[in-house]
């Protein structure tokens, strides 16, 4: 466990991690502060951040399992201690980490007797198991236990309609949220008009993200939600026939880039996040896993550096070079100087 003394700046707004610990492979804790804030700001930020942490961050879950020759969910299988329903509940608890977008397939094929755990799942290369010891089933006889799995990345909850499928597959209710809980509290200090606030934010995650990573992703999601309001043109705001509708001008990556470059190119590079570019989701996720969030981060890496990223291909480099050439008329160095 890491714990730091809380020191409050009287001028510059800053955030800091004051406590972090790993309670288990599937339970991480972090405590953060943001200060100094004016009266009322801490509650505004705390409420928005908590909602973003719990509802806006994506996670990866097993959403379907396929058995062979199983008539219904509450069946028992000879040689297996658990019922089909119990196996489904065990699969629901398995925590995964990935940069997957959409759905993918996985499988388990084990010969008994013995215990089947999460480490027996055969996964695609871009999906990892957080806790390999998670239990799936107990095989009491020398039987072959083979099941197919569907893995999906999403956010929030996914409640499947209970039904039996002809192919022997069963849906699994999924809780995609990597943040288990988030709380905020406020400490006020100072007197009269000089009164200020400190925001304390506590985050518990399931191990697929650290609390710091969750805080960063929630912040990015909130920024993306508000960006259109920052860049709408006043001459495009109007009311139609006294109706309360306000059409917003379309805001593109190129629009934001053009405005920023007029002022300062370095600021522009720091202000453009790669998830706002035209990069495919798979490339974006690979970059994000390597802590590359802005175009400035990207340009601080050479082509050689990017090729060291897991699952990165030469075709991905070509796509990145194409976007840099199109919008910046610059190239990415092949090697680190």
Curated annotation (Swiss-Prot):
One of its GO terms (molecular function) is DNA-directed RNA polymerase activity. Keywords: Chloroplast, DNA-directed RNA polymerase, Nucleotidyltransferase, Plastid, Transcription, Transferase. GO terms for cellular component: chloroplast; DNA-directed RNA polymerase complex; mitochondrion. It comes from the Eukaryota. It is found in: Plastid, Chloroplast. It catalyses: RNA(n) + a ribonucleoside 5'-triphosphate = RNA(n+1) + diphosphate. It is an enzyme of class 2 (transferase). GO terms for biological process: DNA-templated transcription. Residues 1-233 are annotated as: Alpha N-terminal domain (alpha-NTD). Pfam families: RNA_pol_A_bac, RNA_pol_A_CTD, RNA_pol_L. Its EC number is 2.7.7.6. CDD domains: RNAP_alpha_NTD. NCBIfam families: rpoA. DNA-dependent RNA polymerase catalyzes the transcription of DNA into RNA using the four ribonucleoside triphosphates as substrates. Belongs to the RNA polymerase alpha chain family. In plastids the minimal PEP RNA polymerase catalytic core is composed of four subunits: alpha, beta, beta', and beta''. When a (nuclear-encoded) sigma factor is associated with the core the holoenzyme is formed, which can initiate transcription. This is DNA-directed RNA polymerase subunit alpha. It comes from Atropa belladonna. The lineage of its organism: Eukaryota, Viridiplantae, Streptophyta, Embryophyta, Tracheophyta.
